[in-house]
Amino acid sequence: IRDRFGASDAYMLIEGLHTTTTASLKPGGDIVSPAGPLSIGWPVYFYDENDNVCRGFVSAGHAYSTGDSATLNGMTIGVCVDSAFSGRNDAALIKITNSNYSMSDVVNVSNHTLSNDKYMLVSEGSTIYKVGSTSGYRSGTVTSTNGSVTYRINNQPLTISNVLAV
């Protein structure tokens, strides 16, 4: 169902005598973690401990611990089922637990459709794009690969390697 402007960000499901609105969660859109606001990442499907297929998205591992809630507009929409933040990883797997929300295949602010079926290695000179709740939609040219960056977390150095310079 599209609204009068052609948008289809939400649809109505008729269940008996009541109506449920399902809102789209768009990659690059806002989400709130215990550490503060950040972006919704790629949509994913995964198996839980009972081999049930679950829906969710990837977000920033430095902002979540396992069991933390992900919220949007003050409402819990999911829970972190796994989180990694180390020299090679910065990812959290968020399981969508609120049936009023589902993932969209359209990137927030850019209306580009996602391609979930592949990934590619980029080389120097490639143009890459990113979208985030605080950074907006940006692009850049890869100037080098296999770089590293060091952060200080709790006064301890953390070096992340194999990063791109843009």
Question: What residue ranges belong to the model's regions?
Answer:
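Surface-exposed, low-hydrophobicity beta-strand/loop segments enriched in small/polar/acidic residues
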Residues: 162-166
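Serine endopeptidase catalytic core focused on the charge-relay Asp
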Residues: 24-161
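Autoinhibitory propeptides
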Residues: 1-23
